Structure formats: C-alpha cells, structure tokens
A protein has these predicted regions:
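Sec-dependent signal peptide recognition
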Residues: 3-11
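Short solvent-exposed coil/turn linkers within tandem alpha-helical repeat scaffolds
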Residues: 198-202, 259-279, 314-325, 333-348, ...
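The feature captures the conserved acid-bearing segment of alpha/beta-hydrolase catalytic domains
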Residues: 49, 145-216
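Primarily recognizes the serine-hydrolase "nucleophile elbow" in alpha/beta-hydrolase
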Residues: 111-113, 119-164
Length: 382
C-alpha cells in the first residue's frame, strides 16, 4: 500500500517556484508530476494565488479519471475561499493500489510546486473516488476533512469516530443514497450529509460552496484556522434560514440538530437545542422517524432481493429460469414507477434501485438478462 502523507510532509519543507508559471483563475489540465510524468492532474489556482502565503488544498478523485470534472464543481468555492483544487487523471475505479499511487504522486507534486497549508489539506471524490478520498484520509490521520459524494468508506474499513471532518452528499435518485444515510447514522465524529435533487453525480457548484464553507467552520472548531467572525455569522445566518424554511417536523428536527452540532461553541445555539428537544417530545416526529426508517429498510430489502435474484442467474436450469422471470417482473414494475410524471418517494426509490441494477448487471454473465436490462435504460427522464 502506498502511504501518501509522509511523502507530502517531506516534500512540503521545500516549496519551490515550480508552479509560478501556471495560469491563475482557470482550470489547467494535463499537469505532469515531476517524479512520474505518466501521472497527470488538472489544477485550479485561485486568481490571487501567491507563494507569499499558504493555501488550503483539495485533492479530488473522479471514478473515471476525469481530473477536470470535480474542478468544474469546486472552482467557484476555491476562488472565493482561497483553495487550490487538483483532480487526478490516473485515479479511477479499479485496483485501489493504482489510485492510491496516483494520489501519492499528485499530492507530492503539488506540495513541491505550491505553498500549501499542511493543516488544511482535504480530499474529495465521487463514488469509487470518494472511497479513495476516504482511504487516503484514514491512512494519513492528518487530513482536515473529506468531501464524499455518493459513497463512503472503502471496502472492509469502517469507523464511527474519524480524525477528520466529513461532508457527504447524495442525490435523491442516487443508487448509493442509502449508503450515505447509513454513514450519517454511523458517524459520531464531525460530519454533515446533504441530499440534493439529482442522481449519482458530483455535487453541484452551490453545494460545493456549502461544503467548503462547512469545512471552514470545522477548521475554526478544531483550531486549524483562526476564527473569522464575518464568515461565521454569514454561514450561521444562512443555516438559520434553512431551519426556518423547513416544511416538515422531520426536516426542522434534522436541520436544527445540525445547527447545534456545527456551531456549538462558536455561536449561540440554545434556541436550536430547545427546538430539537421540543420536537423530540412530539409523537408526530416519532412517527415520521419511524416511517423514514421503515421506508429505508424496505428499500434495502428490495435491493438485497434483487441482488439474490441476479446471483440466481448463475445457477442454470430451472433455477436460472425462475430468477430471470422474477427479475423481469420486478424490474418492469420498477421501470413503470420510475417513469412517473411526479417526483414522489416511490419514483425516487424506483430510480435508485434501477440505477444500482444498471451498474451491477454489467458483471452478470447472462446475455438474455443483459439485453433485458438494456431495454429498460432511458436516455432521459423528467
């Protein structure tokens, strides 16, 4: 396993002027690592970048090795809050050792070229890239935070108490939606999970802005950064407005609870703590929480049953025929629900389940099943 952080620490002691010739305020792709030119990355330097000060850094990983993809989402936040953002062109879904080596090469190259605040280094990723981002941070114990889009822990590694902050995102139609909900429940260390309208994608630019702002607050909480009263008040006011705008008791409960977690010790939060306590005493909230858990359990059960049926295709004979028949029946019904004209919970669940099938079915060696699944794919939905 490649351990990235020791290399970066050693490299950081000798910040050079190698990066002074790269343009600021725009995405630059194809930057070659000095130690291994086969390793390249895209980078965004804030327009005000200068080696006279140290800068926060986000190392980003796309599941298809598209280094520019995350930078398109993060560049506005990077410009506003003074972050350098880099995306590897070599890290991608596949053997983790390849992506971890790419992370090491990119990280080492960047701290050689640019003036980096080593207390403010973050990782970010989408799907399999999010698992790499988490793996890098879990191995280092020095990262300030991870922004994880549509996936959480790497395979076989879980922890409820992490040494870094986690901002997670999932789309309402994201096939890893349940995984991110579970991550929210598992973590006891500083974290925030936000669901947005969409699928299995990078977080949109406005949410990337919120993620970076949240990391700024966490840096103040952990004393990695000095208190910025103006920024604190700005984010506090925006989040307070979010609480007030909630249209359900469950939404208010979750938003107010997050306010207490995020701002305790930085701003006056007793009002929100009292709001949480009052809601906890209401049967209607308990009913809403129970329904939410029941819905998630139902979806997880359906997902498990579909996976079992897919495995049954490998049995051959009558067992394979029975599994295929059940899959066709269930997936046809899900496809009909997914095509609904209204944005209902049923439609969202159907699209999440189908999205997972579209990915997982690629590994199923059954041509008839593959052809059937392909017939269900829709280029675009409302």
């Amino acid at each position: 396993m490649v351990r990235m952080w020791p290399r970066m620490l050693l490299a950081a002691v000798a910040v050079a002027a190698l990066g002074q010739d790269l343009p600021r305020g725009q995405i630059v792709d194809g930057v070659k690592c000095a130690m291994d030119p086969s390793q390249t990355y895209a980078i965004y330097l804030p327009s005000s970048y200068s080696a006279d000060r140290q800068w926060s850094l986000i190392l980003a990983f796309d599941p298809r090795g598209r280094g520019k993809a995350p930078l398109e989402q993060y560049k506005d936040a990077a410009e506003k809050y003074g972050y350098i953002v880099a995306g590897s062109n070599n890290a991608r879904n596949g053997p983790p050792e390849i992506s971890l080596n790419a992370a090491a090469m990119m990280g080492s190259d960047i701290v050689h070229r640019f003036s980096i605040n080593m207390k403010r280094v973050y990782t970010a990723g989408l799907s399999g890239g999010a698992r790499i981002a988490m793996k890098v941070a879990m191995d280092s114990n020095e990262m300030a935070g991870v922004i994880a889009s549509s996936a959480g822990f790497p395979p076989g590694e879980r922890s409820s108490n992490l040494s870094f902050a986690v901002f997670g995102t999932a789309g309402t139609e994201d096939f890893n939606y349940l995984e991110m909900r579970q991550l929210d429940e598992e973590l006891s260390s500083p974290h925030r999970i936000v669901v947005f309208g969409g699928g299995h994608t990078w977080l949109p630019p406005d949410l990337a802005m919120q993620a970076v702002e949240w990391m700024e607050i966490q840096a103040m909480q952990s004393e990695r950064a000095p208190r910025d009263e103006k920024l604190l008040q700005k984010v506090f006011d925006a989040r307070s407005a979010e609480v007030a705008a909630q249209k359900s008791e469950l939404g208010t409960f979750e938003a107010a609870s997050a306010m207490v977690r995020d701002f305790e010790g930085l701003r006056d939060v007793p009002k929100f703590a009292a709001q949480v306590q009052a809601l906890q005493e209401k049967k209607t909230l308990l009913d809403a929480l129970n329904k939410q858990h029941a819905d998630e359990h139902f979806e997880a059960q359906l997902e498990s049953e579909l996976m079992d049926l897919q495995e049954g295709l490998e049995d051959g004979g009558d067992a394979r025929t029975a599994s295929l028949s059940q899959l066709k029946d269930r997936l046809t019904k899900l496809s009909q629900q997914a095509a609904g004209s209204e944005d209902t919970q049923e439609r969202r669940m159907a699209r999440r389940l189908l999205g997972g099938i579209f990915v997982d079915s690629r590994a199923v060696p059954d041509q008839e099943y593959q052809k059937f699944v392909d017939s269900l794919r829709q280029p675009a939905r409302n």
